[in-house]
UniProtKB/Swiss-Prot annotation:
Residues 218-282 form the S5 DRBM domain. The lineage of its organism: Eukaryota, Metazoa, Chordata, Craniata, Vertebrata. It is found in: Mitochondrion. Belongs to the universal ribosomal protein uS5 family. Its main location: mitochondrion. Keywords: Mitochondrion, Ribonucleoprotein, Ribosomal protein. GO terms for cellular component: mitochondrial inner membrane; mitochondrial small ribosomal subunit; mitochondrion. The gene is MRPS5. This is Small ribosomal subunit protein uS5m. InterPro entries: Ribosomal_Su5_D2-typ_SF, Ribosomal_uS5, Ribosomal_uS5_C, Ribosomal_uS5_N, Ribosomal_uS5_N_CS, Ribosomal_uS5m_N, Ribsml_uS5_D2-typ_fold_subgr. Pfam families: Ribosomal_S5, Ribosomal_S5_C, Ribosomal_uS5m_N.
């Protein structure tokens, strides 16, 4: 064996030019096991160097003779030399790229629905059930797949039996199949505004935060689900889902947000988890209505809200009803005119409610008592707020002609000239 190693060490001297380069690629000079020496015999005797001609074959013949006479190594006849490359094309790709190729999701035609579409394959999470240190040979590595200490002693590296390893692999496969079966189960969802739309459907509370905070007292409602498209150079018209949701706890804290993703459920999750980080606190009068009438315009959407007594209910746009229930407003009238774009409607509603002026703020600004006249109390005023500073002596001036913009529809309703077919309809509280 030592003679063979010395002979191979002389390869740079014996071999020159193209032949030396070829021999250098055929064998590793660090170690020469039995199978490698057998391969050398076949190469030097009758194989790959025959095409180089007979002019420079004398050094090769000497080397072959040295290997055959001085190395007596017996090896089974079934052993073969095989080239091994640990770095291949598949090691360059990520798992997502490999799955796209396996599921035929990379073509632009497949994205656009062109061609005959067979039954769609589903992606499996092969990392589910995997533990660091687990392999096909069942080695037990302390600190990775088994505890480091057992009964007060440090465990050593061991190996499972063949039966135990087969049981572990079967449990892993069963766990993946159960997860896929669980994902296919359809849960009957709550009915929203109508049977064929996502509007008004509850998504439950947002997911817990990274620091352990929970939002069990919050609820999430879907306001709008839309398909949006963007033009890309590779895929053409690419589709994604845009979701608008609102969250609230029914005690004045509420917010809204938008989530966008290619998958609908991912968009729901993004939107509800983002909305809980953009909350508004809405002041409520006696925890059931707004403090005063509000009229606002946001872009091309006009919203007019009116304060109502207890028991009146919510007579508004269905999206406003959903948001008011999340806030905790129980009695209010609202009318929407102009554009009814859902995003503009939601933004305008939150802007108007968050900018309303409470009775205490009005009393401090005017320096006067704020009183309320109720029908059940007659002409007796009820003081609802008093200024914290000095009380002003002169009363608030009253204009002869109040600067109020009248709506012709409201005027006709007040004078009895207009009667809606929905006027006596009572909504069921949900």
């Amino acid at each position: 064996m030592a003679t063979a190693v010395r002979a191979v060490g002389c390869l740079p001297v014996l071999c020159s030019g193209t032949a030396g380069h070829l021999l250098g690629r055929q064998c590793s000079l660090n170690t020469l096991p039995a199978a490698s020496i057998l391969a050398w015999k076949s190469v030097l005797g009758n194989g790959h160097l025959s095409s180089l001609g007979t002019r420079d074959t004398h050094p090769y013949a000497s080397l072959s003779r040295a290997l055959q006479t001085q190395c007596c190594i017996s090896s089974p006849s079934h052993l073969m030399s095989q080239q091994y490359r640990p770095y291949s094309f598949f090691t360059k790709l990520t798992a997502d790229e490999l799955w796209k190729g396996a599921l035929a999701e990379t073509g632009a035609g497949a994205k656009k629905g062109r061609g005959k579409r067979t039954k769609k394959k589903k992606r499996k999470d092969l990392n589910r059930g995997q533990i660091i240190g687990e392999g096909r040979y069942g080695f037990l590595w302390p600190g990775l797949n088994v505890p480091l200490m057992k009964n007060g002693a440090v465990q050593t590296i061991a190996q499972r039996s063949k039966e135990e390893q087969e049981k572990v692999e079967a449990d892993m496969i069963q766990q993946r199949e159960e997860w896929d079966r669980k994902k296919k189960m359809k849960v009957k969802r709550e009915r929203g505004w109508s049977g064929n739309s996502w509007g008004g459907i509850s998504l439950g509370p947002p997911d817990p935060g990274p620091c352990g905070e929970t939002y069990e007292d919050f609820d999430t409602r879907i306001l709008e689900v839309r398909n949006v498209f963007t033009m890309t150079a590779k895929e053409g018209r690419k589709k994604s889902i845009r979701v608008l949701v609102a969250v609230g706890n029914g005690k004045g804290a509420a917010g809204f947000s938008i989530g966008k993703a290619t998958d609908r459920m991912d968009a729901f999750r993004k939107a509800k988890n983002r909305a809980v980080h953009h909350l508004h606190y809405i002041e409520r009068y006696e925890d059931h209505t707004i403090f005063h009438d509000i009229s606002l315009r946001f872009k091309r959407t006009h919203i007019k809200m009116k304060k109502q007594p207890k028991g009146y209910g919510l007579r508004c746009h269905r999206a406003i009803i959903t948001i008011c229930r999340l806030i905790g407003i129980k009695d209010m009238y609202a009318k929407v005119s102009g554009s009814i774009n859902m995003l503009s409607l939601t933004q305008g509603l939150f802007r108007g409610l968050s900018r309303q002026e409470t009775h205490q703020q009005l009393a401090d600004k005017k320096g006067l008592h704020v009183v309320e006249i109720r029908e059940e109390c007659g002409p007796l005023p009820i003081v609802v707020a008093s200024p914290r500073g000095p009380l002003r002596k002169d009363p608030e001036p009253e204009d002869e002609v109040p600067d109020v913009k009248l709506d012709w529809e409201d005027v006709k309703t007040a004078q009895g000239m207009k009667r809606s077919v929905w006027s006596n309809l009572k909504r069921a509280a949900t």
